Amino acid sequence: MSGFAKLKSWLYKASLFVSLILLIGFSVVLPIDSIAQASKSENNAFNTFIVVGALVVFGVFCIFIIIGRMLFHKSCLKDIPRRYIPITPADLPHRSSREAVLQNMERSKELTILLKKPKDPVIHDGLEPPRRCDYPLDEKLFPEYLNYADCIKSLTDRLKYHGLFLNNLDVRMNLEDTFADVVNSQFVNHNANKIQLEKAKEFIDLYETIRFSGKDVTRDQFIKFVKFCLYFGEVSLTRDTSFANLHNFKLNGSSNNIGRTESKYSINPFDENEYAQDDMHYFPEPPTHLVRESSISTVARHVSSGVDLTNSEEHPLDTDSDCNALRLKLSKADSYRSVIRH
């Protein structure tokens, strides 16, 4: 603001102040003079009552007008849309104010275009950033908006409610044991591997820092935590007795033979049963799980003693009479139910 503009502003404020003082001073003279004249008259009480009553009525009327004007002004402001900006001379007579409004509008438009896309990647702790805000050269390892703290908490929830620690089914723990106690019992106690001991201690420190520091989990902390989980998950598989028993069961040939000869289930990919071999083409590789043998093969392998198929196998059936003779022999054989019970 220039010096001339400041001078005009000071003159305006000073003249307004003087005018208000004079107006109030001359307005106070009238009621004071009325009260003084009424007190000198013969009927003092009646005159005083009239003067004071007139002043009270005048004050109430002024207050009513002021309140009504305020309410009317407020109702008029409600009719104006919220997004309306006074830029016309009728709305804003002051020219400098209108120019300031227009300049700020142009500036806001420039800032909107400038800040629409951040210049640098915006990565906040606690959540996986979206691809558009992430570093373009970094590999996207996790889903967008992944909550790191919830993922880490799920590990302790599985340990607490399911007794499962890093896919290890052989977790021996008490109700009062913590995450650090389980890690110590699994990877620290009676362990001579220095690398595993060092990583186990780092794993415990990282977990306690994440869970109890009160700060959001950073991406680096979460990636490090996931690497520890993968590492100790592989280590725990070699120490899980249930997994070892299952592994031995798969590699034990005697178990396969027993399953083939004494049960209707087989895990041997080279089963001597030709009917079971017919189904092997459904598998891309020899299956390691139990495969149920076909009930048709069971029936075919238990031939009743009442049927003699020696001649039929040596002499193929060429005529209708041969087929009828074979059908007659089969009708004399045991039923399907008796064959299954055989």
From Swiss-Prot:
Required for growth under high-pressure and low-temperature conditions. It comes from Saccharomyces cerevisiae (strain YJM789). It is found in: Membrane. Residues 1-15, 69-342 are cytoplasmic. Residues 37-47 are extracellular. The keyword Membrane applies. This is Defect at low temperature protein 1. It comes from the Eukaryota. GO terms for cellular component: membrane. Belongs to the DLT1 family.
